[in-house]
């Protein structure tokens, strides 16, 4: 997903695309360097919002933030080749996300982390993975990339063995299974209920 895309030197997307890091909704945190590279593209505060909420954003917003470099229409493969040819013609070379610091420098990242931790305590008390997500993003500006990636893996491992993760994954698949009851007629009305 997006974790792999942000490790690329450049990214393109169709305008209708949505991008995000939904792992927190399953009790995990984004792996594959997502917590280390996204802050380098959008800044710590926006990365925290995206990672802790798990909600996707549209391609236009992602482009405005710097996650996507080029919005295209039509055939994505042909557009990708054309974009690569344009980069070559303009003499643009590699642009390693992990080496970028312009969105990290000169900003009070610690204040953004403290604010997000306080927000989580108020809105999501007791949830395990959101706080681990914040710790992983904190490593993006507090540690060199290699050490930040190591810290991300450690925190991912903590989330992986969490009972909350197991429960959230179970709930995720249970919701999908419940909507696929074989002998339930398709025209059965949905009923709202307030408690069970």
Q: Model-predicted segments: where are they?
A:
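Amphipathic alpha-helical protein-protein interaction surfaces
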Residues: 34, 43, 76, 126-129, ...
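Long amphipathic alpha-helix in the N-terminal Rossmann-like dinucleotide-binding domain
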Residues: 157-166, 173
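Short, well-ordered strand-loop elements centered on a beta-strand within folded domains, enriched
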Residues: 19, 168-170
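Amphipathic alpha-helical segments at domain termini/boundaries
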Residues: 3-7, 51-155, 173-174, 178-192
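Phosphate-binding active sites in nucleotide-utilizing proteins
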Residues: 194-196
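CoA-thioester-processing core
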Residues: 1-51, 65, 80, 84
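Long, contiguous hydrophobic alpha-helical segments, chiefly transmembrane helices and signal peptides
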Residues: 24, 29-37, 129-137, 159-160
């Amino acid at each position: 997903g997006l974790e792999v895309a942000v490790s690329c030197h450049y990214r393109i997307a169709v305008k209708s695309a949505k991008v995000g890091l939904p792992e927190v909704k399953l009790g995990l945190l984004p792996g594959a360097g997502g917590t280390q590279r996204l802050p380098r593209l959008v800044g710590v505060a926006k990365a925290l919002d995206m990672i802790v909420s798990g909600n996707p954003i549209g391609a236009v917003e992602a482009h405005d933030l710097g996650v996507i470099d080029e919005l295209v229409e039509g055939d994505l493969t042909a557009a990708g080749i054309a974009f690569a040819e344009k980069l070559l013609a303009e003499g643009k070379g590699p642009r390693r996300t992990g080496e970028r610091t312009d969105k990290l420098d000169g900003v009070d990242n610690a204040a953004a982390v403290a604010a997000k931790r306080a927000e989580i305590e108020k809105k999501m008390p007791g949830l395990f993975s959101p706080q681990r997500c914040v710790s992983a993003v904190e490593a993006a500006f507090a540690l060199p990339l290699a050490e930040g990636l190591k810290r991300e893996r450690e925190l991912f491992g903590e989330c992986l063995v969490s009972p909350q993760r197991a429960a959230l994954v179970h709930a995720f698949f249970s919701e999908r299974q419940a909507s696929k009851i074989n002998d339930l007629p398709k025209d059965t009305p949905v009923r709202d209920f307030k408690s069970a």
